[in-house]
């Protein structure tokens, strides 16, 4: 069985997480990581152990996930610091979202019944895991951005939790964001979908200086930021908030209040009709900036956005919220190319650690590609994974064969052939 070796650049990146594993568990990290990145099909432990550089039984590899010594908070901190250090970040754009992974079997830890709104061919209920992910948005070029994950948590339904252990998605996310604030003192901006735009999350991060950019409910009941002037001698208690505003649908129909703005979203430069104003939202108990956008070519395409940072302009709000799409691309990569939803794990530790290692490998691969191919870093993840596979197989074949004229060229041809075969698979 071919036993591949890790490249020096990837070894240095992986070694940044050394403190998260014990002395006995650490050798299994590299032994599992490289086969994981090279495999194109089902990533079973039996298959990965055969390609690992560590000569241990398959049972030892299974025990690494279920019984090995991991320090998950330390691993999350190492991933976070690696991203901040590599890209020299002075301010953070954090994107938050959750994704569903279908599972079969009642004895798998953390599973539950969830409604999948994007399921094909039609929305419906699935049985599986619900993962909450935090990632840092990094600008790869003038138009492209990439989300690098550094934290992942499992949401468990209330009926599957012991008394006193249940936490909502918003509580889990708020606790993780408090850890981010403890690690980074600079400005932090959070991007999230409309499902996280409520006081249970915003109220938890308000005191630590994290602002939110999200989608606004179309039925949100907004009011004027400040109450109007009272007439002299008026009776009753002074109003705390302003008068109610019209419905958002009515505000969106007022054409005179919109102006044309050119924005850069989703790798394109487009012209939108934009309207912005400040309003008090009782659901958050604070004043927010509301941005309404309309497509001049498609009048029915209307979006309602908001931010808790009143200093942001309308263009910044629109372009920031467009960067939230990077985490959707991350979920696609994690499932289709890294096997997040095809894990053969059942116990509590194995389930959580498998997902954590999957996200860590994505971040390590992205950082490796940035260091080795900085000018082409905006390419899709599949291209970066192909580069890593080609270089790994080339170095492995060249190191295992005789030194002769043309041996490096032959090794490179074998590496490219392996990459083409795994890409097709």
Residue ranges and their predicted role:
Residues 1-28, 36-37, 140-156, 165-166, ...:
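A short, flexible helix-boundary coil/loop motif
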Residues 17-25, 36, 40-106, 110-113, ...:
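Electropositive nucleic-acid engagement tracts
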Residues 31-38, 298-325:
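Extended, non-catalytic structural segments that build the interaction scaffolds
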Residues 35, 64-147, 151-154, 261, ...:
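Active-site-proximal, Lys/Arg-enriched surface segment
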Residues 48, 91-104, 134, 189-197, ...:
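Short, conserved catalytic/metal-binding motifs centered on acidic residues
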Residues 58-63, 118-187, 282-304, 308, ...:
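Electropositive, glycine- and tryptophan-enriched low-complexity nucleic-acid-binding patches
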Residues 100, 313-345:
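Short amphipathic alpha-helical "interface-anchor" segments enriched in bulky aromatics
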Residues 159-233:
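Domain-level cores of phosphate- or acyl-group-handling catalytic modules
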């Amino acid at each position: 069985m071919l036993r591949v070796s890790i490249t020096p650049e990837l070894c240095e990146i992986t070694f940044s997480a050394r403190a998260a594993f014990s002395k006995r568990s650490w050798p299994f990290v590299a032994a599992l990581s490289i086969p994981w990145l090279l495999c194109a099909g089902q990533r079973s432990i039996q298959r990965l152990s055969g390609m690992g550089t560590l000569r241990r039984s398959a049972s030892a590899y299974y025990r690494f996930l279920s019984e090995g010594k991991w320090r998950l908070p330390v691993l999350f901190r190492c991933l976070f610091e690696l991203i901040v250090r590599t890209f020299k970040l002075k301010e953070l754009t954090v994107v938050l979202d959750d994704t569903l992974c279908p599972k079969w079997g009642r004895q798998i830890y953390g599973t539950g019944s969830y409604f999948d709104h994007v399921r094909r061919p039609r929305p419906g209920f699935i049985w599986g895991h619900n993962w909450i992910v935090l990632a840092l948005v990094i600008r790869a070029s003038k138009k492209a951005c990439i989300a690098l994950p550094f934290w992942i948590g499992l949401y468990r339904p209330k009926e599957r939790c012991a008394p006193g252990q249940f936490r909502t998605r918003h509580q889990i996310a708020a606790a993780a964001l408090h850890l981010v604030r403890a690690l980074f003192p600079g400005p932090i901006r959070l991007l999230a979908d409309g499902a996280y735009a409520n006081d249970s999350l915003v109220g938890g991060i308000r005191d630590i200086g994290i602002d939110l950019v999200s989608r606004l409910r179309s039925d949100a009941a907004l009011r004027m930021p400040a109450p109007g002037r009272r007439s002299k001698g008026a009776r009753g208690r002074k109003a705390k908030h302003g008068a109610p505003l019209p419905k958002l649908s009515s505000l969106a129909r007022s054409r005179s209040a919109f102006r044309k703005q050119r924005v850069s979203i989703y790798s394109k430069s487009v012209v939108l009709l934009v309207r912005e104003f400040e309003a008090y939202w009782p659901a958050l108990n604070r004043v927010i900036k509301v941005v309404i956008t309309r497509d001049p070519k498609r009048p029915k395409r209307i979006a309602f956005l908001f931010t808790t940072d009143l200093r942001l302009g309308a263009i910044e709000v629109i372009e920031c919220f467009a960067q939230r799409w990077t985490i959707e691309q991350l979920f696609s990569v994690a499932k289709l190319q890294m096997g997040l939803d095809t894990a053969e794990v059942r116990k509590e530790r194995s389930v959580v650690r498998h997902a954590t290692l999957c996200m860590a490998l994505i971040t390590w691969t992205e950082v490796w590609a940035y260091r080795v191919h900085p000018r082409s870093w905006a390419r899709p993840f599949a291209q970066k994974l192909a580069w890593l596979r080609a270089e790994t197989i080339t170095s492995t074949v060249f190191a295992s064969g005789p030194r002769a004229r043309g041996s490096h060229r032959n090794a490179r041809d074998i590496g490219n052939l392996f990459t083409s075969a795994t890409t097709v698979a």
